[in-house]
């Protein structure tokens, strides 16, 4: 895998923003060891703008950073889950044929964005919950409750914040495509 310097910088910035933004002081505690993080919007934005590989690495590295700085140890199962969330949301550009890059973001695109966010959260953190029961002998009901809360909460948060951000990105992209030289 050969990443360009630009891609490495984008991953580093995204992971830092997601990692620091994911700290407990910026989140809303909702259940045992479970926090809704506004930083999920950062992960979604980087995933949509730069694709599945960047989304995966921003989620994976960023969650690792969160766990390191939070002081509770790195939970690789949930680190992997964040990576999977970024990867799945990162499919958005290819599924929409890069319409956002061209300045288009309609309600059909928004619906796809929300579906990808939901699928990413369910599948990504579903893997985390499953692995927690296998590797750490966590109670199934606990991790299933965590998964349910996180998947729904993150999807709502990503949908609300993401709508406004992606509308703004589309508007900016449309304006920059209309520039002409004098």
Curated annotation (Swiss-Prot):
Keywords per UniProt: Cell membrane, Membrane, Transmembrane, Transmembrane helix
Question: Which coarse location class applies to the principal site listed for this UniProt protein?
Answer: membrane
Q: Where are the transmembrane segments?
A: 8-28, 41-61, 72-92, 110-130, 146-166
* Key word Transmembrane present: yes
User: What membrane topology does the annotation report for this chain?
Assistant: Multi-pass membrane protein
Localization terms from the record: Cell membrane
The record's Gene3D superfamilies line, in alphabetical order, gives: 1.10.1760.20
Superkingdom field: Bacteria
Q: Which InterPro entries match?
A: ECF_substrate-spec-like, UPF0397
GO CC, alphabetical? plasma membrane
Family according to the record: Belongs to the UPF0397 family.
Q: Which named protein is this?
A: UPF0397 protein VIBHAR_05109
The species is Vibrio campbellii (strain ATCC BAA-1116)
